[in-house]
Amino acid sequence: MLKQINGGVCAAKGFLANGVLCGIRKNRTKRDLALIMSEVPAAAAAVYTKNLVKGAPLLVTKNNISDGVAQAVICNSGNANTCNANGVEIAEQMCQLVSDTTEIKAKDVIVASTGVIGQPLSIDPIASKIDDLVEGLGNNSDLACEAIMTTDTKKKEIAFEFDINGVTCRIGGIAKGSGMIHPNMATMLVFVTTDCAISAKMLDKAVKADVETSFNMVSVDGDTSTNDMVSVMANGLAKNELIDEEGAAFDAFCEALHGVTSYLCKMIAADGEGATKLLECTVSGAVDDINARIIAKSVICSSLFKAAMFGADANWGRVLCAIGYSGADVDVTAVDVSFESCKGRVDVCKNGAGIPFSEDEAKTVLLESEIKVVISVGNGVGKAVAWGCDLTYDYVKINGDYRT
């Protein structure tokens, strides 16, 4: 059972964090450089964007943690360090700066960047503030969380306590993501820390399995970023028996990990650029989970559906349309659709055809800030959940002048 606690990435034993302003982008006053550090080397795992254009930090991180070990994360916002001729060199220098000011090896540093693509990233502002960044390390998950934000309007962090064979463990995470959210593992960065003792092999297995039902089920605008990354460090300081195989302990860890990731997914979707509503699509009765995920993701990605939700329009035909072109193995004559919110539920489609409903009641349901579209596609065992947001005028405004 999970117990929500405070602390974010600093909730787990032995983790410190900080965030400072180093001035990567001109005329900005927000923090733009974050550091998360474990007091001891930790098992590490990560998943990355499937975009063929990858940020230099991802390439460096993938090489650094190929041995399954990391001890720190450094991340800048305001510049993606992507499509830069010297990008890898800059990312490696960021790792070396951490090493020079701590006792951590440069190869044990996870490095990440988020921001504008194709603009040179100078190491100078980062180097000028690395001492302040390290000296200020403490229980400052919120500062690190602020420092990785770009167009985000809200900080995204969470932590839980959970039990492994009678031993209390903790896990926490921070995330950024508001636009370019359509991961295939927005820009989406997620950093998770835990004091649970788990082998790098099993951690990698847990992370790769989890993203299929968490971050890969989130979409804000259908754009897959060049810099998407989800990383997890597990330092073992909870002193539970090492999890090195499948079983009850591994299942408990996976449940805790999913508690963090699913919470952050909802926060990312709700904070979509210009968004006014969090959308959740649940699918049941599919042939299998894979087909259920295809259906849920297709609906949540539909621009027409998202626009209808912005207008509180119960246009269920757009849901059926998205199901039809999804490519899923589905009998469209067996599809039922309902809309739900805190104001109630309205059934709009039965067996693939419209049914009478009150437009006024539907409008009342859809005017809320959190909307569920509930879809049943038959009697199969497959089910899935996907998250997204409505499509508004402000999304265009935000992205029309992003570089300025």
Language-model features and meaning:
Residues M1-E89, Q93, S99-T404:
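A structural signal for small-residue-enriched, beta-sheet-centric alpha/beta enzyme cores
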